[in-house]
A protein has these predicted regions:
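A generic structural signal for nonpolar/aromatic side chains embedded in well-ordered alpha-helices
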Residues: 18, 69-70, 114, 150
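Structured helix-beta-strand junction loops
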Residues: 20-21, 72-73, 144
């Protein structure tokens, strides 16, 4: 078995990893052809019927550089990674087509969902609802934001912990 196959995550492992991490790096192609990389908060949602999942969603300001980039080329590469030492490195890279959604009825609930996820410290019980001032802030921001639906086309995964400290 190749090293590549040895470190590859299963579908369940990759889904659990994505659910447990909190920041995705989103790479789009900038106006001068250089990659434009930015961190994003995200949530995972079930995919539409008949599709494999989960599907990653985020939001950003509608006038952001990444949205301008996606208007020219709707492709993005996403990476979620963890670990510091080589034998601890693990991650998921997704090549995606991005659907930029402008409808407030899509954007506002997504913003609430994102803030609900991040209102809870890592490892703590989820909050039952957002504090009212946070919910109001999200509602105000929603009119300036867009939803980003990342439709996965290809994936690569790695988990160097599977090598048992060797390479």
């Amino acid at each position: 078995m190749s090293r590549r196959e040895q470190i590859k995550m299963s579908e369940d492992e990759a889904s659990a990893f994505l659910a447990g991490e909190r920041t995705v790096t989103c790479a789009t192609q900038g106006p001068r052809g250089w990659p434009h990389l930015m961190p994003l908060w995200y949530v995972l949602r079930d995919p539409p019927a008949g599709e494999q999942g989960p599907r990653l969603w985020s939001w950003t300001y509608g006038v952001s550089q990444k949205v301008n980039n996606l208007g020219r080329d709707p492709r993005a590469t996403l990476q979620v990674e963890a670990g510091e030492l080589y034998q601890e490195l693990r991650g998921v890279m997704l090549e995606c087509e991005v659907r930029v959604r402008h409808e407030l009825e899509t954007v506002a609930p997504l913003g609430q969902e994102i803030f609900h996820r991040y209102a809870t410290p890592r490892g703590a019980e989820p909050v039952s609802e957002l504090p009212p001032e946070v919910a109001q802030m999200v509602e105000k921001q929603a009119v300036k934001r867009v939803a980003l639906e990342f439709v996965e086309l290809r994936r690569a995964t790695w988990d160097h912990r599977k090598l048992g400290g060797t390479y």
